[in-house]
């Protein structure tokens, strides 16, 4: 019922974009699915293709420093100082959420995550020209749990909680993100060289290790080794029940098929996934599509995983499939074990 949980989990990582923020006049949005390439890997120097798993907004600012200190009353304070582009009109820049990534080993990253998202007592804001800091009505929120944060597409018939568990145990770095909320309520001047936020912790920072701005990164987003592919056209044969799929124009010896996204016949019949139970033949679905497809993965002689396409449906049972029917497929590919 859930074949997607039996597939190989693709390679994943977190990338940091480094815009020339001093020259930016406004935020820049990068849509989900933006493609990045790895460094050359292996004997053939293959560049593995990764795509971003969510949209990211690059702001015209940078985190200049992050410093941990102690207030006169004994409370731990984290000071975050941001440098801002002099070309941006800051009264118009949307700062409703600034995402951060905890770029550290697991013990430090988890301690920082807990301090910011669960141990914050108060936030203070300091602007140029202010004699003293002012209270700020803001907070930090944990990221990575929303429907828009999924690392790979969710199956129609699966429970989203299972995917969260699978993502946590396979790529915990996805949940090492947090977002700063509340700056949209601040009235900034049109020209803003810098601003500073003091995060007062409810409980003292008792850990032996400290952190700097190197451990708190802006402009980061998860990426996964998935990318769009096309398959060689298939011509149906009445004597065949399975068809091995081959990516079109890919002969590098590393590319594998991760999913079959759509199947369309030359007579404009749409095949639906068997696991979606949207095909004709039961549950009073008289108007549903007459065709379905299913995939099976087998390891080939070369060690790569080959994907086989299995076709069925009421049209096949009644032998009403047109002769010389051909299929066009859209696929999602991966580089398999090569990037690991």
Where does each model-flagged region fall?
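Extended assembly-interface regions of large multimeric machines
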Residues: 1-131, 135-137, 141-144
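Short, aromatic- and glycine-rich surface loops/edge beta-strands on solvent-exposed regions
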Residues: 37, 192-202, 324-332
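N-terminal start-of-chain detector that recognizes signal peptides
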Residues: 70-72, 167-170, 300-301
